[in-house]
Amino acid sequence: RTDAIIEIAMRPASQVPDLPLDFAKLSLFDWMTCGIAGTNEPLAVKLRQLAAGEGGQPLATVLGGMRVPPRMAALVNGATSHALDYDDTHFAHVGHLSVGIYPAALAIAEMQDASAEEMITAFLLGAEGAIRVGMTLGRAHYNHGFHQTATAGAFGATLAAGRLLGLDSLQMRHALGLCATRASGLTSQFGSMGKPYNAGISAANGVECATLAGLGFTSADDGLMGHQGFVGAHLPGGGAVTGPDLALDSYKFPDNKYKLHACCHGLHPMIEALQASEAAAGVPLDDIKSFSLSTNPRWLAVCDIKRPRTGLEVKFSYNWLAGMTLRGDNTADDRLFTDTIAGEAELGRFAE
């Protein structure tokens, strides 16, 4: 099964069709837009301070202005581009592919002087691999508390970086094995700086593991799908690795979804429904006594912070987003999600 993942990353560029590449280009635009917009977020500033303090060879660009070693650039850019939680989502993968993979691809592409086309192709094939790892782990992995953006996503970052570094299939196997002992990220971080940090960890792990494998660093023979490998260790009861066919018989990345609101994707159906409803149009929040919503129960463990304390937590609050939507706030504006709005008395009364 790991061989199938490796084969995806090694596919000749001439065999990659235009449609998935077009979606990869759209996601490059989406990712860079989110990254540039996120550069003034406190977590982005702090990570650039970390990067400046560590120094190192200026081989890769950081969003916000500086050049640092590739692994650090991937860390900072991954977290920065996820800071606003406005980036794309792939629901079969159960995570955000662009923020965890593109920063790794960009950092290595700069170092290798690769073309934009080579970087985009590496991203796409890395994403296809990450989607299949995510599908194999299944939704139970996410429901158990793991953030697939950072777990399954790290393998996609490793594949993308490894392709750009020119790793052969054996080196790619070792890179995935190293990633298996590095990949991490928890959903308990949602609503904090730790969530975007997960995306940065994914990208940085990809750069590190692919680079080490290129230097001859070895790992267990099959750290991804093998006995006591990453997937098996994360399955309930540590069972045998099963799941969907992993071959690249069709491209899954075009199922990627793009956000229209600057908050958790799980809140978007509610926002869209309330915006389309005329039942409460023009009614002051204080005059609304109650109303009911139905949603998939899985989202209650993701974006149901009852009393958000920060702008980041507002992005994961049914209560706050319902009130904001009903009173006509522009939830597409990322500048709206501040610590000030988390403390608004009107929204607090509505949430009760």
Regions found by a protein language model. Give the residues of each.
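Glycine-rich, mobile lid/loop segments that gate access to catalytic sites or pores
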Residues: E110-D113, E117-E208, L215, A220-H227
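Residue-level detector of well-ordered alpha-helical segments, enriched
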Residues: A24-L28, G100, E118, A122, ...
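Hydrophobic alpha-helical hairpins/lids featuring a short glycine-rich hinge
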Residues: N77-M135
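Active-site catalytic microenvironments for nucleophilic, acid-base chemistry
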Residues: A107-M111, L164, A273-A276, G328
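Short helix-coil transition sites and intra-membrane helix breaks within transmembrane domains
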Residues: H93-S98, F146-T151, L260
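Short connector loops/turns at beta-strand edges and beta->alpha or beta->beta junctions
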Residues: S81, G100-Y102, A107, G129, ...
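Short amphipathic alpha-helical face segments that pack within enzyme cores
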Residues: S27, V99-A107, E128, A152, ...
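Terminal-appendage/accessory-domain detector
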Residues: R1-V94, G191-A204, T211-E352
